[in-house]
Amino acid sequence: MLIKEYRIPLPMSVEEYRIAQLYMIQKKSREETCGEGSGVEILENRPYMDGPGGNGQYTHKVYHIGMHIPSWFRSILPKAALRVEEESWNAYPYTRTRYTCPFVEKFSIDIETYYKTDPGEHGNVFNLSAAEKRQTILDPIDIVKDPIPPHEYKAEEDPKLYKSVKTKRGPLSEDWIQEYKNNPGKYPIMCAYKLCKVEFRYWGMQSKIERFIHDVG
């Protein structure tokens, strides 16, 4: 199992992020529904008590991913290989999401997230033991400085160029995090702390596949 903790500072409040997250979930669902062999199926959607993060909303979805696979390859695969199951526990500002594939029994992705009103300096937000911390790779992400693959780049989404008409925030400078820290109260800042555990328990491929999933996820 490969475990990483990602810390992603963002120039907004925790409540603003909650609204943005709901929008992106709906947008992603629409994008995934575009023809035969595609779409999102909701199997269960209910409130829960005393679960992960306390009280929240549990959702069980199935993503049909046939559209992402070449037709010649899709034709030889069993149907179980063309679906990914997602279980989600949303007790915002805490969430947990788990992905599995029925066709690959020894594969899973487990993501715990805390959304905090700080610039990413919490020492141990997940209350990891000393042994767990030694196993975890810390990977801070800067939305301005970190490189973006050319095929994914969109100028209208570049934080170095974008300015919000509504909030008047942006564009962001190279040292935006330090600027926000130096002006507490003037600019909202939050951090998404994500503890991601990727497991692919197949001998000979485990380390390579787990690293690949973290790199492209």
Region spans (language model):
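Eukaryotic helix-grip
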Residues: 1-217
